[in-house]
Amino acid sequence: MRHYEIVILVHPDQSSQVPAMVERYQSMIKEKGGKVHRLEDWGRRQLAYSIDKVHKAHYLLMNIESDQGVISELENAFRYNDAVIRSLILKRDHAITQSSLIMQGAEKGKSSRKEKVDAEAEASEEA
């Protein structure tokens, strides 16, 4: 089996359907004997350029291990799903399981904001 990295851009109006879509795609992969090594939901982000007059999209990243048949099924599912405005499937040499740079940056941002709030609360208690 080969390793793949998949990025999916979902129409922002369909963000509520993302968990169901992810579940459907994961079940497609697992039914055929594949594995999902990493799944990240990057949320709604600004696009670099508009796609079909849409300026934002809901981003998903998946790293999977499967055979070519599953990839063909996923490509067809992406193509015929109106909520998916773009998809990219890349072949990788090995499985990638660590967090992406985008998720690491988001985690650092959350921790630094929490530290800032704690520091402000401590300062207000002293005053």
Curated annotation (Swiss-Prot):
Task: List the biased-composition ranges (Basic and acidic residues).
Answer: 107-119
Q: Where is this region: Disordered?
A: 102-127
Could you cite one Gene Ontology molecular function of this protein?
Answer: small ribosomal subunit rRNA binding
GO process annotations (BP)? translation
**Disulfide bond entries:** none
Please indicate which superkingdom the organism of origin belongs to.
Bacteria
Which residues are listed as membrane-spanning? none
Sorted alphabetically, which keywords does the UniProt record give? Answer: Ribonucleoprotein, Ribosomal protein, RNA-binding, rRNA-binding
Q: Which Pfam families match?
A: Ribosomal_S6 (PF01250)
In the record, the note on similarity to other proteins reads: Belongs to the bacterial ribosomal protein bS6 family.
Role, per record: Binds together with bS18 to 16S ribosomal RNA.
User: NCBIfam families annotated for this entry?
Assistant: S6
Q: What is this protein called?
A: Small ribosomal subunit protein bS6
